Regions:
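N-terminal helix-cap/turn-to-beta initiation motif at the start of protein domains
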Residues: 152-158
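Secreted glycan hydrolases and related glycan-binding modules that recognize and/or cleave
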Residues: 150-151, 170
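Loop/turn elements at helix/coil->beta-strand transitions in domains of secreted/extracellular proteins
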Residues: 80-83, 158-162
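Non-catalytic substrate/cofactor recognition surfaces at enzyme active-site rims
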Residues: 1-150
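Glycine-centered flexibility sites
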Residues: 91-94, 159, 171
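Short, tryptophan-glycine- and acidic/Ser/Thr-enriched carbohydrate-recognition patches
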Residues: 165-177
Protein backbone atom coordinates (compact mmCIF):
# COMPACT_ATOMS: atom_id res chain seq x y z
CA UNK A 1 0.00 0.00 0.00
CA UNK A 2 1.00 3.58 -0.54
CA UNK A 3 0.93 6.27 2.12
CA UNK A 4 -2.02 8.14 0.61
CA UNK A 5 -2.87 11.72 1.55
CA UNK A 6 -5.62 12.45 4.05
CA UNK A 7 -8.62 14.46 2.86
CA UNK A 8 -7.17 17.82 3.93
CA UNK A 9 -3.87 17.22 2.12
CA UNK A 10 -5.66 15.88 -0.94
CA UNK A 11 -7.95 18.95 -1.08
CA UNK A 12 -4.89 21.23 -0.84
CA UNK A 13 -3.12 19.30 -3.60
CA UNK A 14 -6.14 19.33 -5.90
CA UNK A 15 -6.64 23.08 -5.42
CA UNK A 16 -2.98 23.78 -6.15
CA UNK A 17 -3.03 21.60 -9.27
CA UNK A 18 -6.19 23.31 -10.54
CA UNK A 19 -4.50 26.70 -10.11
CA UNK A 20 -1.36 25.41 -11.85
CA UNK A 21 -3.22 24.24 -14.92
CA UNK A 22 -1.34 22.39 -17.66
CA UNK A 23 2.09 23.91 -17.10
CA UNK A 24 4.94 21.98 -15.48
CA UNK A 25 5.38 22.38 -11.71
CA UNK A 26 7.44 25.47 -10.82
CA UNK A 27 8.38 24.65 -7.23
CA UNK A 28 8.54 21.90 -4.63
CA UNK A 29 5.00 22.61 -3.39
CA UNK A 30 3.54 22.01 -6.83
CA UNK A 31 5.65 18.89 -7.29
CA UNK A 32 4.60 17.57 -3.88
CA UNK A 33 0.95 18.29 -4.65
CA UNK A 34 1.23 16.38 -7.93
CA UNK A 35 2.72 13.41 -6.06
CA UNK A 36 -0.11 13.39 -3.51
CA UNK A 37 -2.70 13.18 -6.27
CA UNK A 38 -0.76 10.35 -7.93
CA UNK A 39 -0.60 8.37 -4.65
CA UNK A 40 -4.32 8.94 -4.09
CA UNK A 41 -5.09 7.65 -7.58
CA UNK A 42 -2.82 4.60 -7.34
CA UNK A 43 -3.53 3.62 -3.69
CA UNK A 44 -1.36 0.48 -3.84
CA UNK A 45 1.12 -1.53 -5.86
CA UNK A 46 2.33 -5.11 -6.00
CA UNK A 47 5.86 -5.52 -4.68
CA UNK A 48 7.61 -8.55 -6.19
CA UNK A 49 10.29 -10.00 -3.90
CA UNK A 50 12.32 -12.97 -5.10
CA UNK A 51 15.07 -15.28 -3.90
CA UNK A 52 17.18 -17.74 -5.81
CA UNK A 53 20.08 -20.01 -5.08
CA UNK A 54 23.06 -20.97 -7.19
CA UNK A 55 24.97 -23.64 -5.32
CA UNK A 56 25.84 -22.14 -1.94
CA UNK A 57 25.15 -18.57 -3.06
CA UNK A 58 21.81 -16.90 -2.32
CA UNK A 59 20.37 -13.90 -4.15
CA UNK A 60 17.49 -11.85 -2.76
CA UNK A 61 15.83 -9.28 -5.02
CA UNK A 62 13.52 -6.35 -4.39
CA UNK A 63 11.88 -3.86 -6.77
CA UNK A 64 12.90 -1.04 -4.45
CA UNK A 65 15.93 1.06 -3.64
CA UNK A 66 17.06 -1.03 -0.72
CA UNK A 67 19.01 0.63 2.06
CA UNK A 68 22.41 -0.82 2.96
CA UNK A 69 21.02 -1.53 6.43
CA UNK A 70 18.27 -3.66 4.90
CA UNK A 71 20.80 -5.55 2.80
CA UNK A 72 22.89 -6.18 5.90
CA UNK A 73 19.82 -7.48 7.75
CA UNK A 74 19.20 -9.93 4.93
CA UNK A 75 22.84 -11.03 4.72
CA UNK A 76 23.13 -11.42 8.49
CA UNK A 77 20.08 -13.68 8.74
CA UNK A 78 20.27 -15.49 5.40
CA UNK A 79 20.43 -19.28 5.72
CA UNK A 80 23.36 -19.24 3.27
CA UNK A 81 26.62 -17.49 4.22
CA UNK A 82 27.11 -16.05 0.72
CA UNK A 83 24.16 -13.78 -0.01
CA UNK A 84 23.72 -10.93 -2.45
CA UNK A 85 20.88 -8.41 -2.35
CA UNK A 86 19.86 -6.84 -5.65
CA UNK A 87 17.53 -3.89 -5.77
CA UNK A 88 15.37 -2.33 -8.48
CA UNK A 89 14.68 -5.77 -9.94
CA UNK A 90 11.30 -6.40 -11.56
CA UNK A 91 10.10 -2.91 -10.69
CA UNK A 92 10.93 0.51 -9.35
CA UNK A 93 8.87 1.09 -6.22
CA UNK A 94 11.27 3.68 -4.83
CA UNK A 95 13.07 4.00 -1.53
CA UNK A 96 12.09 1.72 1.33
CA UNK A 97 13.64 3.25 4.40
CA UNK A 98 13.59 1.16 7.56
CA UNK A 99 10.87 2.42 9.94
CA UNK A 100 13.44 4.17 12.14
CA UNK A 101 14.55 6.30 9.19
CA UNK A 102 11.09 7.89 8.99
CA UNK A 103 11.72 9.47 12.40
CA UNK A 104 14.86 11.11 11.02
CA UNK A 105 13.15 12.48 7.89
CA UNK A 106 14.70 13.28 4.55
CA UNK A 107 13.55 13.26 0.94
CA UNK A 108 13.54 9.47 0.88
CA UNK A 109 10.79 9.41 3.54
CA UNK A 110 8.41 11.86 1.85
CA UNK A 111 5.21 10.24 0.63
CA UNK A 112 5.63 10.38 -3.15
CA UNK A 113 5.82 7.83 -5.93
CA UNK A 114 9.59 7.46 -5.40
CA UNK A 115 9.15 6.67 -1.69
CA UNK A 116 5.45 6.18 -1.13
CA UNK A 117 5.23 2.67 0.29
CA UNK A 118 3.79 2.37 3.78
CA UNK A 119 6.18 2.80 6.72
CA UNK A 120 6.00 -0.92 7.52
CA UNK A 121 7.10 -1.89 3.98
CA UNK A 122 10.78 -2.46 4.78
CA UNK A 123 10.29 -5.02 7.57
CA UNK A 124 7.58 -6.76 5.53
CA UNK A 125 9.80 -6.95 2.44
CA UNK A 126 12.74 -8.11 4.57
CA UNK A 127 10.62 -10.83 6.17
CA UNK A 128 9.30 -11.96 2.77
CA UNK A 129 12.84 -12.16 1.38
CA UNK A 130 14.06 -14.14 4.39
CA UNK A 131 11.17 -16.58 4.02
CA UNK A 132 12.01 -17.03 0.35
CA UNK A 133 15.70 -17.54 1.19
CA UNK A 134 14.66 -20.26 3.64
CA UNK A 135 12.57 -21.89 0.90
CA UNK A 136 15.29 -21.93 -1.75
CA UNK A 137 17.99 -23.09 0.67
CA UNK A 138 15.93 -25.64 2.58
CA UNK A 139 17.42 -24.19 5.77
CA UNK A 140 16.23 -21.89 8.52
CA UNK A 141 17.54 -18.35 8.72
CA UNK A 142 20.50 -17.65 10.95
CA UNK A 143 19.87 -15.90 14.24
CA UNK A 144 21.74 -12.74 15.04
CA UNK A 145 23.18 -11.77 18.37
CA UNK A 146 24.42 -8.50 19.74
CA UNK A 147 28.13 -8.15 20.27
CA UNK A 148 29.63 -6.81 23.47
CA UNK A 149 32.95 -5.70 21.97
CA UNK A 150 35.18 -2.72 22.82
CA UNK A 151 33.23 -0.25 20.69
CA UNK A 152 30.02 -1.11 22.49
CA UNK A 153 31.76 -0.84 25.87
CA UNK A 154 33.12 2.63 25.00
CA UNK A 155 29.60 3.83 24.21
CA UNK A 156 28.36 2.60 27.58
CA UNK A 157 31.32 4.21 29.36
CA UNK A 158 30.38 7.57 27.79
CA UNK A 159 27.13 7.43 29.79
CA UNK A 160 24.56 8.25 27.10
CA UNK A 161 20.97 9.03 28.06
CA UNK A 162 19.92 6.49 25.42
CA UNK A 163 21.66 4.72 22.56
CA UNK A 164 20.78 2.95 19.35
CA UNK A 165 22.80 -0.19 18.66
CA UNK A 166 22.15 0.01 14.89
CA UNK A 167 21.72 -3.74 14.84
CA UNK A 168 18.02 -3.88 15.58
CA UNK A 169 16.28 -5.84 12.88
CA UNK A 170 12.63 -4.89 13.26
CA UNK A 171 12.14 -1.19 13.89
CA UNK A 172 13.06 1.78 16.06
CA UNK A 173 14.14 1.20 19.64
CA UNK A 174 16.22 3.47 21.83
CA UNK A 175 17.51 1.67 24.90
CA UNK A 176 17.79 3.52 28.18
CA UNK A 177 21.29 3.16 29.54
Amino acid sequence: KYRVPNQQLLAWAQKLMEEKGDRAPKNSQESYAREQIALHQQQSTEVVVQALRIGDIAIATTPTETYALTGLKLKLQSPLPKTMVLDLTNGADGYIPPPEQHHLGGYNTWPMRGAGLEISAEPRITEAALGLLENVSGKLRRTSRQTQGPDFQSVLEAGPIAYWRLDELAGPLAIDS
